[in-house]
């Protein structure tokens, strides 16, 4: 198992520091050698930069990768978008010598060189491949009696030919990691549908973004779950703060708690909701908070 540098991206440190805290607590408890990545910038967002200025995207992404190469560590992301951007850039530069040379000519101006010695990992992909559900269960001290609506997101599993995660049309690897915590991953209609945040939709097409989200929330609500679990802070933002916008636009009253997988796993590893920053979310469901505090205290 290689040493890791933790790439937080933009949304985690600026909007959801609880995800950062939860991730670091989980990594420590699982005895994973991971450290911060000083100097890291935006990944940058694959659905924006890559689509209209590939050279700039590669230069910015490779700069982040080089920071980790210098530390002789692989990059660990907690965000689907960051994973997609960095993993795709890493792969393209390794496969295309001409593109690599062009990118290195840009990096040379700041005293850097991309060598291609680091791999890009997503925390879900990493835990599944390096631990697996059964080994992960050995660390669980507080099994979670929760029904979960799992959201994979887009960049974690696409493009499927590059992700090496098995069937990406009906995947199960993330479900298995959720159920390793004792929680139940509940199936629901349009589970694999985009949340409506990525690709510039949330920022450029707000109405369409909220319509997509409302459909997802309706399907999730009908499944009768305790919470939504995701693996991406941008999806997390969409489900959490987006619920408030959906309620205002459509006159609905959704109040579905939203957790990043690091927070769910943290609960199962024995950390309290307060330690994991769960109460920092926009959606505050008193019944859910009471339930997870009871679980955390061993009263459930």
Swiss-Prot record:
GO molecular function per UniProt: 4 iron, 4 sulfur cluster binding; CoB--CoM heterodisulfide reductase activity; metal ion binding
GO biological process, one term: methanogenesis
Reactions that this protein is recorded to catalyse: coenzyme B + coenzyme M + 2 oxidized [2Fe-2S]-[ferredoxin] = coenzyme M-coenzyme B heterodisulfide + 2 reduced [2Fe-2S]-[ferredoxin] + 2 H(+)
Key word Zinc present: no
Pathway: Cofactor metabolism; coenzyme M-coenzyme B heterodisulfide reduction; coenzyme B and coenzyme M from coenzyme M-coenzyme B heterodisulfide: step 1/1
The keyword Cell membrane appears for this protein: no
Cofactor descriptive note: Binds 1 [4Fe-4S] cluster.
Location of the protein in the cell: Cytoplasm
Keywords, in A-Z order: 4Fe-4S, Cytoplasm, Iron, Iron-sulfur, Metal-binding, Methanogenesis, Oxidoreductase
Cofactor dependence: [4Fe-4S] cluster
InterPro entries: CoB/CoM_hetero-S_Rdtase_bsu, Cys_rich_dom, HdrB/HdrD_reductase
Chief place of localization: cytoplasm
EC number: 1.8.7.3
Enzyme kind, highest EC tier: oxidoreductase
GO cellular component, one term: cytoplasm
A matching Pfam family: CCG
Subunit description: The ferredoxin:CoB-CoM heterodisulfide reductase is composed of three subunits; HdrA, HdrB and HdrC.
Described function: Part of a complex that catalyzes the reversible reduction of CoM-S-S-CoB to the thiol-coenzymes H-S-CoM (coenzyme M) and H-S-CoB (coenzyme B).
Similarity comment: family membership: Belongs to the HdrB family.
The protein's name: Ferredoxin:CoB-CoM heterodisulfide reductase subunit B
Organism in which the protein naturally occurs: Methanosarcina mazei (strain ATCC BAA-159 / DSM 3647 / Goe1 / Go1 / JCM 11833 / OCM 88) (Methanosarcina frisia)
Phylogenetic classification of the source organism: Archaea, Methanobacteriati, Methanobacteriota, Stenosarchaea group, Methanomicrobia
Gene: hdrB
